[in-house]
């Protein structure tokens, strides 16, 4: 008896999966439900629900299929909750860490300074990003992929990180120190109140860098991952009348998703640099820059 974890990059592909549990199987405004349980919280009216990593109602499975739309710390946490062999990660000893994962999922990594997290949990978070998140392959956009091995790898790594493994924690500390280099490497140009950044899979996430290396702060970021063909826009702080999710869905349809403060292009589509520039222009115009 085994639990199989599957990644579906689009709603159409996800609809063909007979899943017992779905973990953030959210594709813009489309939510794929599991026959046993659905863990989702990114839809309007669902913001009060816990992120999967903090959802104690997710049942444990002896066998079955778990479906996800993407893999990040919060989604991994939800997947691991379905496995009794990783129940020690959720016994309450590491609640601060999981609260931080929830915070990042809802608010974005750029808000880490407002999370109230301890230095220890911040190092643990960066350790996960450095050792697991950044090592994930780029999954195909046109088919469902078995990710069971990756879930177990993440669980084993988290167990080491949370138990204080020096090698893992050192990688997290080094990642935090890398921020200045990342700022310089991803900077493209300024458009009004928006910083345009270009990254790739190796360089990594950069939507938390609202201040340039010269110390100038901006209201928003538009970032383009040229390997993934993905666009992510985000706001440093809430702006009346500006919703990142609405902008992305207006431009690319309902499968673009996220929150008012941070949102991305449809997971199954490869976006061009021209589309990235147009998105940045739309964001800048709406802000008024």
Where are these regions (language model features)?
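Catalytic core of tubulin tyrosine ligase-like
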Residues: 156-163
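Oxyanion-binding "anion nests"
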Residues: 164-194
